[in-house]
């Protein structure tokens, strides 16, 4: 179990190199209520941002650096980012609760970051066109699809413009710093979750335009943006990481993720066991009995730590205990 925020994964090999994993959360050194994202840096220099959420201050956040690729699991506000952070996460007074200062991001935090960093956005199915429009709203020009080459569907970064990649079931892409050299393989895997944009949460016609927005709202319907996804990342040092996204327990955790990909590390999204996604009991079962990684990072707990330590009596503490740590 790795409950801390600044993480280095050391692959035990003759020529070992590290994959750096960092949380860009509401408050540095804490696991806060709205923290959803992780930033992965491969030894080759490829940098991948996972589910940006609302705890990054848009594309100008100084913690970002280069962002070559952004992964999005689904379009719920806390993952795509209907708001962005409006505080210094390093300040001693920085908030760590759901009321931490934020400002509206009408085209989503993800699109602001991609437009500023010329990132390649990897998503499942219908989400690519939805995200492309949000980036176009910011840049004023259409957002192209990302190029690919070779048997591994390779794409070289950094790029000079943002682009989108639409992966279907079983799809893979490889992101590399230099053409012909090894890179990070990104494979899409299923998730069981809702993937809708609620028109009632849209404060303007930017998120959903009329007449679609009005027609959906008048009929009490959300906009469905294709199926949600998870990912398996294979880094150049051999490390494989399973990103569950928001999901319930599913057979593919065993048949596809464990048996085929065999990840060493899993990042599992956990909640209080309500209707949204797995609670600590379900998540512990999924990790220990189905996925069987060597280490686990819990995410999405909606609970703040204190002084970087897990608060007793919380779902985070319950999950750790169930994992036998």
Language model: regions and residue ranges:
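Active-site environment of divalent metal-dependent phosphoester hydrolases
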Residues: 29-34, 57, 76-81, 127-132, ...
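Active-site-proximal segments of metal-dependent phosphoesterases and phosphodiesterases across multiple
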Residues: 265-287
């Amino acid at each position: 179990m790795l409950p801390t925020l600044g993480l280095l994964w050391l692959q035990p090999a003759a020529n070992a190199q590290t994959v750096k994993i960092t949380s860009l959360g509401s408050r540095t050194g804490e696991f806060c209520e709205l923290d959803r994202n992780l930033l992965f840096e491969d030894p080759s220099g490829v940098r991948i941002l996972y589910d940006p959420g609302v705890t990054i201050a848009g594309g100008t956040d100084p913690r970002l650096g280069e962002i070559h690729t952004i992964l999005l699991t689904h379009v719920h506000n806390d993952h795509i980012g209907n708001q962005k952070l409006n505080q210094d996460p390093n300040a001693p007074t920085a908030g760590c609760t759901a009321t931490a200062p934020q400002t509206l991001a009408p085209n989503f935090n993800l699109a602001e970051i991609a437009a500023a960093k010329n990132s390649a956005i990897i998503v499942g199915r219908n989400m690519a066109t939805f995200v492309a429009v949000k980036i176009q709203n910011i840049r004023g020009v259409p957002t192209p699809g990302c190029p690919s080459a070779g048997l591994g569907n390779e794409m070289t970064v950094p790029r000079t413009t943002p682009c989108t990649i639409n992966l279907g079931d079983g799809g893979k892409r490889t992101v590399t710093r230099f053409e012909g050299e090894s890179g990070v393989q990104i494979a899409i895997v299923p998730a069981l979750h809702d993937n809708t944009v609620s028109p009632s949460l849209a404060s303007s016609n930017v998120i959903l335009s009329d007449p679609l927005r009005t027609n959906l709202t008048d009929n009490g319907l959300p906009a469905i943006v294709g199926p949600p996804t998870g990912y398996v990342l294979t880094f150049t040092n051999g490390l494989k990481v399973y990103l569950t996204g928001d999901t319930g327990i599913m057979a593919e955790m065993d048949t596809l993720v464990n048996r085929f990909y065999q990840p060493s590390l899993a990042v599992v999204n956990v909640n209080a066991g309500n209707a949204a996604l797995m609670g600590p009991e379900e998540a512990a079962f999924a990790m220990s009995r189905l996925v069987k990684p060597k280490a686990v990072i819990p995410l999405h707990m909606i609970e703040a730590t204190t002084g970087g330590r897990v608060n007793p009596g919380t779902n985070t503490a319950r999950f750790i205990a169930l994992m036998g740590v």
